[in-house]
Amino acid sequence: MPRLFAAALTLTLTFTLTAADWPQFRGPARDGVSKEKGLLQSWPDGGPPLAWTAKGLGGGYSTVSVSGDRIYTLGNKGSDSHVVALNRADGAVLWTAAVGPAGGSLGCTPTVDGGRVYALGQMGHLVCIDKDGKRVWQRDLHKEFGGKKGGWNYCESPLLDGDRVIVTPGGTEATMLALDKATGKEVWRCPIATRHTEAGYSSVVVATVGGIRHYVQLFNGGLVGVSTDGKVLWTFEKLGGNTANVPTPIVMGDHIFSSIGYGRGASLLHLTAENGRITVREVYYARELTNKHGGVIQVGDYVYGDTDDSGRPYCAEVKTGKVIWKRGDEGTGGGSASVTFADRRLYFHYDNGTVALVDPSPGGYREVGSFTPPRRNGSSWAHPVVCDGRLYVREGDLLYCYDVRAKQ
């Protein structure tokens, strides 16, 4: 495994951003890892200082994207889902723009490129919206491309790659789809012949193996690799047919780590390229490494994530799948935990609202601070985001912004 622990993912996605941006779900590299330094390594009692609170986001579990002087998220308001734009400085709502009909708990996160925002609604309406909240174009994944959503509708965050938008309608006609990001016109569609064809709730990532750059996605048919011109390169159906496949895969050089929930577990795959083809070998299958929807983070030689949705995070060795530790009764959070990483620390957002700062040590689960936001609205499933010295925590209609910069 000579390249397993190399720089995990080098995305050449075309974003107009600064080093202080977080323009899409799980950040610039879609791995949940921030490159920031100079952050608090522990928190005082009560947590870090609260910079501001925003309200009026609507219902749902979507997290935020941060770009320039704006923050974007999605929320259900009445019978429709909306993109919500906020001022980055104080959280003031600047505008809202309808995406399409609401359908249950909204979990998609907008993707931002310069002055345009791309968002997918629960019922399959994919929209491009300009910086003033005006719709540039819209496509319907179900009606136009034969899309087949899962039981909780769509929950994907669009991928921007160069001049294209990549999404996963599901179904047999266009299981994966590429559109021109400027016009919304179809570039290619890729039918994927697996036993289960419903869209999952994961988001597409980019992998390059042996010079072959391609898209990797976890949907209800399992894992798939699709070329940049829309051809199926490989499939791995062992993880298919689940109640819901949610966590976004982690690209680790020529390896793919993918965890799913409902007691199923995780697989590490080794990809080999030869003569323009990619072959896949399963390195291991680890039933203990389940994860429903909180995501998994790679830090060095280890991966960290919640065990299914139990509120019992684990640390496991990447190369073997061996569990090094699993949280017991220590710590403060409870229920499903989503996670991000910044400046040598894990940030867990638990279902009971608790936000915990954790030292990612293979020696055990060790919190170095925790707090609970003042108010909550139902389950706390939105992934935390750390960007430009700020920690963003979504609680339904509310967004909290905390200052996590270390004092000089």
Question: Model-predicted segments: where are they?
Answer:
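Noncatalytic, solvent-exposed loop/strand surfaces
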Residues: 17-408
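N-terminal secretory signal peptides that target proteins for export/translocation
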Residues: 1-2
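Bacterial N-terminal signal peptides
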Residues: 6-16
